[in-house]
Amino acid sequence: MNTLVIVLIAAVVLVAAYALYGRWLAKTWGIDPKAQTPAVKYNDGKDFVPANGGTGCSHQFSSLAGAGPVTGASQAAAFGWLPVLLWVLLGGVFFGAVTDFGALYASVKNDGKSMGMLIEKYIGKLGRKLFLLFCWLFCLIVIAAFADMVAGTFNAYTVVDGVTQLADAAQTNGAAGMVSIMFMVFAVVFGLVQKKLNLSGWKEAVLGILCIVASFAVGMNCPLIFGKATWSYITFVYIFFAAVLPMWLLKQPRDYMTTFMFICMIAGAVVGLLVAHPTMNLPVFTGFNNEKLGTMFPILFVTVACGAVSGFHSLVSSGTSSKTVENEKDMLKVGYGAMILESLLAVLALCVAGAAAAADGTPAAGTPFQIFSRGVAGFFEMFGVPNYAATVFMTMCVSALALTSLDAVARIARMSFQELFSVDDMAHAEPWRKLLCNTYFSTVLTLVLGYVLTKIGYSNIWPLFGSANQLLSALVLITLCVFLKVTGRSNKMLFPPLVIMLCVTFTALVQRLMAMVSAIQNAAAVTIPAGETTWGAVFIANGLQLIIAVLLIVLGATIVVNSMRSYVASKHNSEAKV
């Protein structure tokens, strides 16, 4: 099938969903353009910073568009491209976008409270504590997986027959790494200038584009040839500053600048597909069971992950984005619209992977990011862009996908950890509690543990990430059901996605747990750091994940039971009032 037809069908469905279903949700729940939002009410120049709809949407999309849409859609295509396309469209419209918009809506209507605080208000303190611990563990997994991927993307070395040598893509990877560093530097410059001059509209856009051009000009001419370990250190240093600095100084300007790159990347993919309109070489459907991945249920759903629905998105919506919404009318654009864009990105990634596959349906060699990067870079070359420039640009884009999620999740992890131990009267709290709630201490502790988990390796931790991510979305949906019920708003549209996600995620987690137990019992061979013994390697790759998986299952089940009790109680109270 022609990939152009697939993209056009997806675009029509997603745009129609935003215009019809998204607006219906906003009308059903109620939007008040005259209401004072938390960003305006509590503007502190750090976490609460008012931003217009465009900037808010760019922040949301940049934070959401991590490794998931590209990696998930490409990997899940092992079941065939049609099941992936259907789940991305249906999941994105009725599951993901609804969850993201709902989380943002609930937070804005509650003074910008994070999901943990919302759970305390509508479900109880125990539910909040359990949820915050769940979120923090989940964030550790995300930090480890994405940081390992970023460091690997910029790595200029490879090992051949036990000998470390420069990789063929050393210059390209090194240039992309330097561009990324300069991107951070110029993001701070952008933030300072924006803060002083209060630019908007085309002036703000021009400044952002100039900063992007400057970053590429320096980076492409001064590549940094470092190994993976060095890039890992650099990545974690960046994450630290992104987690503690004011939003306006680094994260917001970086997200704004990154959005321009994403637009160029998506435009390049779309125009390339329009001009070349390559054939979708991947099979339509391969069966309900895949030898490598497992059964379609639940693996397809947790593998596609962020392209259809993601619990992480809700943490961004309630943790950072709700504190930047300047007007309630922007919530639809920020919450529902950004997710629609991410679903479109997943469709593009699927089509690029399909075009890169061999005529007999054999997938292209390389990781999903490498396949996507090479494919879109090839489209840019069609328009006269030099191969080196196109490859550096796309390498930077795919790494930015992970970095924008990394800085968001690091801030969310820090805030979740602080909320976990905070009390109302922190001025008279115990010294140990003050230490744990200290911004710098909580950030360092989180990042150190995240760094330790990178030793597991991105490929080993991804399956657990997908399952935990989807379970998080189910927990958020339960909270939203209670919130909407208590506040007298309709919540019926949340029941189908809630039930389906609970079934999918608990099944996937149990399957993953059983697989890890089996691997440990059999001392199975796994991809491990050099120098580890077999049993030590099995524990690193499976034992630590087993511990986290058990904790996630127990925490998730406890939160579900606790939330259901609260929902029944709130329903009875509501009926009693009537």
What are these regions (language model features)?
Residues 2, 70, 82, 141-166, ...:
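Transmembrane helix-loop junctions in multi-pass membrane proteins
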Residues 2-19, 76-107, 116, 175-187, ...:
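Extracellular loop-to-transmembrane helix junctions
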Residues 16-30, 134, 174-218, 228-275, ...:
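Membrane-interface loop-to-helix entry segments
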Residues 16-70, 259, 295, 299:
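Membrane-interface "cap" regions at the ends of multi-pass membrane proteins
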Residues 23-49, 72-75, 85, 89, ...:
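Flexible loop linkers connecting adjacent transmembrane helices
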Residues 67-74, 91-99, 103, 107-111, ...:
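Membrane-helix boundary/coupling elements in multi-pass transport proteins
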Residues 101, 273-287, 340-375:
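Extracellular/periplasmic helix-exit of transmembrane alpha-helices
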Residues 125-140, 337-343, 390, 419-455:
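Loop-to-transmembrane helix boundary motifs in multi-pass membrane proteins
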